[in-house]
Amino acid sequence: MGFIVGVVIGLLVGIAIIIGFVKLENSRSKLRSELANTVAAFARMTVEDSRKLLPPEFYPSWVVFSERQKLTWLNHHLTKIWPYVDEAASELIKASVEPVLEQYRPAIVASLTFSKLTLGTVAPQFTGVSVIDGDKNGITLELDMQWDGNPNIVLGVKTLVGVSLPIQVKNIGFTGVFRLIFRPLVEDFPCFGAVSVSLREKKKLDFTLKVVGGDISAIPGLSEAIEETIRDAVEDSITWPVRKVIPIIPGDYSDLELKPVGMLEVKLVQAKNLTNKDLVGKSDPFAKMFIRPLREKTKRSKTINNDLNPIWNEHFEFVVEDASTQHLVVRIYDDEGVQASELIGCAQIRLCELEPGKVKDVWLKLVKDLEIQRDTKNRGEVHLELLYIPYGSGNGIVNPFVTSSMTSLERVLKNDTTDEENASSRKRKDVIVRGVLSVTVISAEEIPIQDLMGKADPYVVLSMKKSGAKSKTRVVNDSLNPVWNQTFDFVVEDGLHDMLVLEVWDHDTFGKDYIGRCILTLTRVIMEEEYKDWYPLDESKTGKLQLHLKWMAQSIYRDS
């Protein structure tokens, strides 16, 4: 009997082991199959699939997803035909750049021309291409190009004293993006009328200068002047939005040439919390602004001495040639007198972010380099008011001098492009927006503690920047959230160029302590005529003011 029971138990255990083994094998087989499918799926993944799976914050800094296609085939064929391209391109470059070199010729130079110009035997390498969508009437390509060539470029330089110097341009290293626009599309072969060529982005342009048979440093300042002239010539002859239009089929292609499309008006208001570049005292900041980095198109503000929170309140105008791609660049420098100015920080804003005909009030964070966006150091901020005014009667912006329904500032600031309207634009600069500004200081909140009792005795000093008119509120004792509800009226002679400054002070028996300030242009109140808002205190960790502003305008004109 025991034997039979043992046999039965053995059979049951054996069957259980077999069943368990089969299930384990099936499970392992299923896992292997799933793993194989997963590996196969990864093998089929595209770059776009990877970008969908992982958000950008998980990418290492060295991972870059390129949208460009490789051009090995083009580089192979370009190497073969380069001797012919060299000859044709050299003539084209000479014809395009030489007049611009003469235009930007330094004052110490009497003439500046090309004595020799060939591009050498090394062909450039195209590292990628992409197609830009959105143009129904043409095809736009962008080509990444890198060139470390051996060109033979000699400039014929004649100084004011009559000395001729052959200056060789050597060791050229260039990296950039070229834009080719095939437009307009036509029915005749090759199906486009012209090709527009432009340098869309200049990533790197390095070169050295050498006097043939001499030393360029023998003439102080000549090397720097020639180098700046070359860079300006490249910028003004081929860099976007400038383009070279090459007709393929005979026709009128004047519409493809560069034309101004609008005007950008910029009010440089102020900056705050700038990095101090001086070991003794404070920096002496000034600003440079440009849309295209050319000498005559770059605007410079006045220098504010010994101030890390400068107030400029200056107005500048810039011609816009392509609002969809151009941007305004602001660079803040520390004025070092006879020495080279030191960069404090820079910022930029794309013009496509501006709504035509509407004033945009922005604070831009300053960075060390616009190309590197990982700068976390606090370099300060700059305050701008921007107004983009497109040219042309079809842009929806009406002539400001014939529309009574617009606000005062809109009547002053908007213009069009006809001759009559351009005359109005010139007249606009002589407009004075005069009126009465009514300011009600309502209250403040979260004023910083100023005394040992954990309280403050705040009051507000109001002043007009241009006229110097001043008023002040009463003192509210022992309060970090004071309420004043006091109204002050200021007669403003030129509202477009004046500013309201409100300083908050702590009253003490034997003096006063500065807490913070608010600086307001009159742009918003002139446009809206009346509003109420909160304003944070600059130069203070906490605190804000609630104000009610009202404008009663009377626009007049200077006699001209």
Swiss-Prot record:
Superkingdom to which the source organism belongs: Eukaryota
PROSITE patterns reported in the protein's UniProt record: C2, SMP
Annotated residues for binding of Ca(2+) 3: 451, 506, 508, 513
Entry keyword set: Calcium, Lipid transport, Lipid-binding, Membrane, Metal-binding, Repeat, Transmembrane, Transmembrane helix, Transport
Any GO MF annotation of the entry: metal ion binding
Keyword Protein biosynthesis among UniProt keywords: no
UniProt: Ca(2+) 1 binding residues: 278, 284, 334, 336
Residue numbers binding Ca(2+) 2: 451, 457, 506, 508
Region (Phospholipid binding): 227-523
SMART domains reported for this sequence: C2
InterPro entries xrefs: C2_dom, C2_domain_sf, SMP_LBD, Synaptotagmin_plant, Synaptotagmin_SMP
Residue intervals of the SMP-LTD domain: 67-249
UniProt cofactor(s): Ca(2+)
Assigned protein family: Belongs to the synaptotagmin family.
Function description: May be involved in membrane trafficking.
Protein name, per record: Synaptotagmin-5
Lineage: Eukaryota, Viridiplantae, Streptophyta, Embryophyta, Tracheophyta
